[in-house]
């Protein structure tokens, strides 16, 4: 069985408050799953490069073994356009696509939200999320804007967004989510709470900027790309824990050209 899920960008990072917000974007991960007697085998390719970390695949299989009470093996293939360790929800997209493909292969009658929650559980077990990333998972699976209580696994707000152009800046370094375990985010909580309030009111542009500047400063990411984007009238934010920065702009080509001095640049759109 085949399934797909998309990347997303952050409106509010949940590290400080447990409440997160994200919007889907048009970069995709596709998974193919076949059942077999036992064991797990397959391959993962991200933007043409082979990845050998199968932790998430094993965790998804374990979640569904427990859900069904059955023992089974899987043969899988994952192809992804989403850069990893950049804050662009590559893990959420993979968990969603794998969970949907495996649920279909097993013939399970699951709602879409049940599939999403199974993927979140697998991501927690695999250690690729600190908060559960329920917001990222919803934005990845469904598209649109989502605000969620990640600790309580509750949807607080959801609304459609226009398919506006998005520019992604991918600096040379990467940052694994698990490397931030134990980091104290309480000093920035009051500022992130303001971003949450704005996101709940649908003011995602303002929320993304506040969140991005606060987390970028706290985590030591450069903010010069923010200044350049703001000068061009773009909506700009930090995606996840970074280092990826995104901008929603009506001048994607011009901003992309200016951002190339900081790293690799991709263009896509909201979904």
UniProtKB/Swiss-Prot annotation:
Its EC number is 2.7.1.71. Its main location: cytoplasm. Keywords: Amino-acid biosynthesis, Aromatic amino acid biosynthesis, ATP-binding, Cytoplasm, Kinase, Nucleotide-binding, Transferase. ATP binds at residues 83-93. Pathway: Metabolic intermediate biosynthesis; chorismate biosynthesis; chorismate from D-erythrose 4-phosphate and phosphoenolpyruvate: step 5/7. It comes from the Archaea. It catalyses: shikimate + ATP = 3-phosphoshikimate + ADP + H(+). GO terms for cellular component: cytoplasm. It is found in: Cytoplasm. InterPro entries: GHMP_kinase_N_dom (IPR006204), Ribosomal_Su5_D2-typ_SF (IPR020568), Ribsml_uS5_D2-typ_fold_subgr (IPR014721), SK_arc (IPR010189). GO terms for biological process: amino acid biosynthetic process; aromatic amino acid family biosynthetic process; chorismate biosynthetic process. It holds the Pfam family GHMP_kinases_N. One of its GO terms (molecular function) is ATP binding. HAMAP family: Shik_kinase_arch. Belongs to the GHMP kinase family. Archaeal shikimate kinase subfamily. This is Shikimate kinase.
